[in-house]
Amino acid sequence: MDYSAALDQAIGKLHEEGRYRTFIDIERRKGAYPQAVWTRPDGTETRITVWCGNDYLGMGQHPVVLAAMHEALDATGAGSGGTRNISGTTVYHKRLEAELSDLHGKEAALVFSSAYIANDATLSTLRKLFPGLIIYSDELNHASMIEGIKRFDGAKRIFRHNDVAHLRELLAADDPEAPKLIAFESIYSMDGDFGPIKAICDLADEFNALTYLDEVHAVGMYGPRGGGVAERDGLSHRIDIFNGTLGKAFGVFGGYIAASARMVDAIRSYAPGFIFTTSLPPAVAAGAAASIAFLKTAEGQLLRDQQQLNARILKMRLRGLGMPIMDHGSHIVPVHVGNPVHCKALSDMLLADFGIYVQPINFPTVPRGTERLRFTPSPVHDPKQIDHLVKAMDSLWSQCKLNRSTSAA
């Protein structure tokens, strides 16, 4: 076999379909977010505004977070020095897990190197804990959940997105004595729509199923203390296992689960993705704990309120220009383009001509024909930056002769 030719063919196919991913070289500057510096391919630097970042609230540069990280770095050095089982558990890791369990009203929490690993490791391990377990998964669950469920050596059922009636049919068709788990999300990041948490919890109660809720795009963002959509809706006590990230609203790095002490102890003891990997650096754990604690306060609520206001303003202004907004009421602002080449071209022109960075979202992240630009306004985007973005989108939409409409489903 000609291995080089096979690789060239695989990459060439992505180029032909307009979905080859390019990395934009940007450098965030302390105290200036959402502004950053883009280093062009020729080495020149251009000041830009980031409109697609996951640092939803700007906590990655908050003084409280940076101070905690500096203190831990000066006290302990760079790395943790080992796995959690072998010299890699510190007071900073324990403090972080205490903040997380408190955030979700659970007995315990467990920190992983990322939310992807937390999902993959936890979901793939559950068969060891519950022989005969059947997992019911929303068809639009994140790739990390899908991978974990694929590696789960047990029965799997996929229900149509947010379709509670279909989920009921699947649950009712299986052995009532079989252990069951329903895996779903509170906010689906590509469309920005909410999962029907209460309705799924009602079904879980009826069919004696565990609930597994991914709140990656909601923790820090919703609820009076940033505990996510389940906290906002008063449903945290009905969720058996939470998954979340430390790298979005909390602005740092890492992932976690929160659950009962028994559940966390079992995952800690059986999940290879937790056991056989170096733990988070103490400075990262310290920064994440400080961020979580801050976002539980009234000051944290002010950031959430401003972020929601900015998201509403951006949606209103883009919709007023006929942009096909996909608005499900969350903080995420997707604009439907529907063509990978156009989507990439819009992204490139926004960056090169207007200093606006938003990454195109193409297949396989979203289905073919639903390609989009996905904006994530933060509380630190100011009115001038919003105005500049709206005018740029208006100009390029006309230049590219794209259709305008009042809404998009």
Swiss-Prot record:
Coiled coil: none annotated. Its cofactor is pyridoxal 5'-phosphate. The active site is at residue 248. It comes from the Bacteria. InterPro entries: 4pyrrol_synth_NH2levulA_synth, Aminotrans_II_pyridoxalP_BS, Aminotransferase_I/II_large, AON_synthase_class-II, PyrdxlP-dep_Trfase, PyrdxlP-dep_Trfase_major, PyrdxlP-dep_Trfase_small. One of its GO terms (molecular function) is pyridoxal phosphate binding. The keyword Acyltransferase applies. Pathway: Porphyrin-containing compound metabolism; protoporphyrin-IX biosynthesis; 5-aminolevulinate from glycine: step 1/1. Pyridoxal 5'-phosphate binds at residues 189, 217, 245, 277-278. Its EC number is 2.3.1.37. The modification N6-(pyridoxal phosphate)lysine is found at residue 248. It catalyses: succinyl-CoA + glycine + H(+) = 5-aminolevulinate + CO2 + CoA. Substrate binds at residues 21, 137, 156, 365. Keywords: Acyltransferase, Heme biosynthesis, Pyridoxal phosphate, Transferase. One of its GO terms (biological process) is protoporphyrinogen IX biosynthetic process. Belongs to the class-II pyridoxal-phosphate-dependent aminotransferase family. Homodimer. NCBIfam families: 5aminolev_synth (TIGR01821). This is 5-aminolevulinate synthase. It comes from Paracoccus denitrificans (strain Pd 1222).
